[in-house]
């Protein structure tokens, strides 16, 4: 039997709280990959292991606002 995936996917909302100035280029690219490029911007993303890894990499620059 095949298992059906639920229609609603888990999401996570992140807000940028730190500046990418004077940071490593890889951290800047990670912020861009998350869709964050300016202070206080928020973005709702699909909660996947890849996104969680990106959030962990720049945890000092972002804040998790909501997990749904």
Swiss-Prot record:
Supply the alphabetized keyword list.
Ribonucleoprotein, Ribosomal protein
Cellular component aspect of the GO annotation: cytosolic large ribosomal subunit
Traced from the root, the source organism's taxonomic lineage reads: Bacteria, Pseudomonadati, Pseudomonadota, Alphaproteobacteria, Hyphomicrobiales
Q: Name one GO molecular function term.
A: structural constituent of ribosome
User: Which residues are connected by disulfide bridges in this protein?
Assistant: none
Pfam families referenced in this protein's UniProt entry, alphabetically = Ribosomal_L30
Name this polypeptide is given: Large ribosomal subunit protein uL30
Specify residue ranges for compositional bias: Polar residues: 8-18
Q: Which family does it belong to?
A: Belongs to the universal ribosomal protein uL30 family.
Q: Tell me one GO biological process term.
A: translation
Region feature (Disordered):
1-26
Note the Gene3D superfamilies from the entry: Ribosomal protein L30, ferredoxin-like fold domain
Assembly and partners?
Part of the 50S ribosomal subunit.
Recorded superkingdom: Bacteria
